[in-house]
From Swiss-Prot:
Role noted for this protein: This is one of the proteins that bind and probably mediate the attachment of the 5S RNA into the large ribosomal subunit, where it forms part of the central protuberance. In the 70S ribosome it contacts protein S13 of the 30S subunit (bridge B1b), connecting the 2 subunits; this bridge is implicated in subunit movement. Contacts the P site tRNA; the 5S rRNA and some of its associated proteins might help stabilize positioning of ribosome-bound tRNAs.
GO molecular function: rRNA binding; structural constituent of ribosome; tRNA binding
Subunit: Part of the 50S ribosomal subunit; part of the 5S rRNA/L5/L18/L25 subcomplex. Contacts the 5S rRNA and the P site tRNA. Forms a bridge to the 30S subunit in the 70S ribosome.
UniProt keyword list: Ribonucleoprotein, Ribosomal protein, RNA-binding, rRNA-binding, tRNA-binding
Protein name: Large ribosomal subunit protein uL5
Taxonomic lineage of the native organism: Bacteria, Pseudomonadati, Pseudomonadota, Gammaproteobacteria, Enterobacterales
Signal peptide start and end residues: none
NCBIfam families: PRK00010.1
tRNA-binding among keywords: yes
Xref: InterPro entries: Ribosomal_uL5, Ribosomal_uL5_bac-type, Ribosomal_uL5_C, Ribosomal_uL5_CS, Ribosomal_uL5_dom_sf, Ribosomal_uL5_N
Length: 190
């Protein structure tokens, strides 16, 4: 079992109950799922780019990705409706907690020139999306075997009612959000 899940149940729930004055444990926000997606624009030219992206995403997540297709044709991007343009994977339960732990403790510290993640990436509904420029920050990817650098989007979906609740939830896990943006910081001291 993932350590972060145990930490959430033993510490985070009670800290958030105290801070937001929830009456029930069920009101405390939690992470529902993590979605990782890769858009592979080069797959229009060569299908091998998409195959390699699928392999990379499968190694990173531990789960087989789903191929995403274009919803409509866009001439300027040279894509047609139904054309395979990327892949995504949705992690829940055990795999979600394991990935979240690896993301916080291993992958994010390996980002070059890292100064914290922006808090402007909250969507207004308590979900957080971050972009990663290089897949090589994950230890599962062998640097010698990659054919190119690919980025990805990681969306952390919570059941928090507001961005402030989601911010406090992610900070409770020591998620490296920038401190200088203090619009979500609590008025109470811990």
């Amino acid at each position: 079992m993932a350590k972060l899940r145990d930490y959430y149940k033993s510490h985070v729930v009670y800290d958030l109950m105290r801070e937001f004055k929830y009456k029930s444990v069920m009101q405390v926000p939690k992470i529902n799922k993590i979605t990782i997606s890769m858009g592979v624009g080069k797959s229009i030219i060569n299908k091998k780019f998409l195959e390699r992206a699928i392999e990379d995403l499968e190694m990173i997540s531990g789960q087989k990705p789903v191929i995403t297709k274009a919803r409509k044709s866009i001439a300027s991007f040279k894509i047609r409706q139904g054309q395979e343009i990327g892949c995504k994977v949705t992690l829940r339960r055990k795999r979600m907690w394991e990935f979240f732990e690896r993301l916080i403790s291993i992958a994010i510290p390996r980002i070059r020139d890292f100064r914290g993640l922006s808090i402007k990436s909250f969507d207004g509904y308590g979900n957080y999306t971050m972009g990663i420029r290089e897949q090589i920050i994950f230890p599962e990817i062998n640097y010698d075997t990659i054919d190119g650098i690919r980025g990805m989007n990681i969306t952390i979906t919570t059941n928090a009612v507001s961005d402030k609740e989601a911010y406090v939830l992610l900070r409770a896990f020591r998620f490296p959000l920038k401190n200088n943006d203090s619009i979500y910081t609590s008025t109470e001291e811990h």
